[in-house]
UniProtKB/Swiss-Prot annotation:
It comes from Cereibacter sphaeroides (strain ATCC 17023 / DSM 158 / JCM 6121 / CCUG 31486 / LMG 2827 / NBRC 12203 / NCIMB 8253 / ATH 2.4.1.) (Rhodobacter sphaeroides). It comes from the Bacteria. The lineage of its organism: Bacteria, Pseudomonadati, Pseudomonadota, Alphaproteobacteria, Rhodobacterales. Its cofactor is a divalent metal cation. This is Putative dimethylsulfoniopropionate lyase DddL. Homodimer.
């Protein structure tokens, strides 16, 4: 006699309209936004779109992970409110519809105590689900106001971030507003700071090999290494 769990049919993407519509919003961001004349950004955007199109066409399995919150998710409601007023309203609304099903996490074995209260991320598509995929990861990262996310990098992973809400800066190079996209090439060391009045919500896409995306090896750089590389 089969158990109840064995008799329940595996959910697929087309059975879960809220997840599907959220992917539509990712597709719109990477299809309709500008590359600013940058060939690497243009290539990355196309890679994300093409990978996502193949995933959606395949109607992958959806494995709902147990919802999990972190201290910073107390700021999520405000971030979504701000997002609905900005350049990526559709993304903010679509994310709000699945907010109670998100699994927020840190990704590091050891997280500085101050950062643990101000940062978390959630994946919505990738090797661990909830929407199962092997060669692409999509998700969101949330920062509290006045956060400094220390120097770090991702080996063999190309990553892009699109602002949904809040103002932030990477490596003190510019201030990014909702709707803007930045691209980090594999291995690029980067440090993020956020404005002091509002939370910051970013949508992201990671591309890389199946092996690397399964084991991204997230690790904060040592302060000494960061200082040496900056010539300090």
């Amino acid at each position: 006699m089969h158990s109840l769990s064995e008799r329940v049919e595996q959910l697929r993407l087309n059975d879960c309209p809220d997840w599907l519509y959220l992917l539509h919003e990712f597709d719109a961001l990477y299809r309709q936004g500008s590359d600013g004349g940058s060939r690497p950004i243009r290539t990355h955007r196309k890679r994300v779109r093409d990978s996502l199109a193949l995933i959606v066409e395949a109607n992958p399995a959806v494995n709902d992970r147990p919802p999990e919150v972190k201290p910073v998710t107390a700021h999520l409601g405000r971030a979504l409110d701000l997002g609905e007023r900005g350049a990526v309203q559709g993304m903010s609304r679509a994310l709000a519809r699945v907010a109670g099903r998100l699994t927020w996490e840190y990704g590091y074995e050891k997280v500085p105590k101050a950062l643990a209260r101000k940062y978390a991320y959630c994946e919505i598509l990738g090797p661990r689900g909830p929407i199962c995929a092997e060669r692409l990861i999509l998700g969101f990262v949330l920062f509290a106001p006045s956060t400094t996310y220390p120097q770090h990098s991702h080996k063999d992973i190309e990553e892009s971030y699109i602002s949904v809400a809040g103002a932030w800066s990477e490596n003190d190079a510019a201030v990014h507003a909702p709707g803007s996209l930045i691209l980090n090439r594999p291995g690029l060391e980067h440090r993020i700071t956020t404005g002091d009045l509002s939370p910051c919500l970013l949508a992201y896409a990671w591309t890389g090999s199946e092996e690397r995306l399964n084991q991204p090896g997230m690790k904060l750089s040592s302060p000494r290494k960061a200082r040496i590389e900056k010539g300090i």
